[in-house]
């Protein structure tokens, strides 16, 4: 019986040693698995933080870019408003011409035009300085230049700040102050902007 007791004790001892080895091995494997999972979780945390930081930088960049665009648009709008004011002031200044200055402007510009001389002159609705006598003077000078000299003052009046339109057969030569300043603006806007904004 002592053999059986000894054998049983030996089996129990071996089982204890074996279970201790199994437990130690399991603890080592458990530590390795936990360390791996912690490492993976830490890497994912870093990746998530990195992505969040990158996204916030991109978002911040977009916000800054949009703000810069808005500022640029506001500056551009302000510059356009200033240019509008400058060219509108030019039209207003022209519209304050004296009667003599206006008549000289009309006569001189008509005499420079390549026209037949039988057009109709249309002036502003409140313009009373352009008279039939004045048109007759222009016609005499047109005759002297070999033109027909039959320009007529139209009964039709238009809403303009000053100047005139010559019309014949549906074709118009627009020499209103607004049109002349617009034409000058197209040619000079970059130059004027350079003077104003540099």
UniProtKB/Swiss-Prot annotation:
It holds the Pfam family vATP-synt_E. The keyword Ion transport applies. InterPro entries: ATP_synth_B-like_membr_sf, ATPase_E_C, ATPase_V1_Esu. One of its GO terms (cellular component) is proton-transporting two-sector ATPase complex, catalytic domain. One of its GO terms (biological process) is proton motive force-driven plasma membrane ATP synthesis. GO terms for molecular function: ATP binding; proton-transporting ATP synthase activity, rotational mechanism; proton-transporting ATPase activity, rotational mechanism. Keywords: ATP synthesis, Hydrogen ion transport, Ion transport, Transport. Signal peptide: none annotated. Gene3D superfamilies: ATP synthase, E subunit, C-terminal, F1F0 ATP synthase subunit B, membrane domain. Produces ATP from ADP in the presence of a proton gradient across the membrane. Belongs to the V-ATPase E subunit family. This is V-type ATP synthase subunit E. It comes from Clostridium novyi (strain NT). The gene is atpE.
């Amino acid at each position: 019986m002592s053999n059986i007791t000894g054998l049983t004790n030996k089996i129990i001892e071996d089982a204890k040693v074996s279970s201790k080895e199994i437990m130690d091995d399991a603890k080592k494997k458990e530590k390795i698995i936990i360390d791996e999972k912690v490492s993976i979780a830490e890497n994912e945390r870093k990746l998530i933080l990195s992505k969040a930081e990158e996204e916030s930088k991109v978002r911040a960049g977009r916000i800054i870019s949009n703000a810069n665009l808005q500022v640029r648009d506001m500056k551009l709008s302000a510059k356009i408003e200033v240019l509008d004011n400058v060219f509108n002031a030019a039209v207003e200044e022209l519209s304050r011409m004296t009667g003599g200055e206006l008549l000289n402007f009309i006569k001189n510009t008509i005499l420079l035009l390549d026209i037949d001389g039988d057009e109709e002159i249309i002036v502003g609705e409140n313009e009373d300085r352009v008279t039939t006598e004045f048109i007759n003077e222009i016609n005499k000078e047109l005759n002297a230049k070999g033109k027909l000299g039959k320009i007529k003052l139209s009964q039709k009046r238009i809403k303009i700040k000053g100047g005139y339109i010559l019309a014949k057969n549906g074709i118009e030569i627009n020499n209103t102050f607004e049109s002349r300043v617009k034409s000058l603006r197209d040619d000079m806007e970059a130059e004027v902007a350079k003077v104003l904004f540099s």
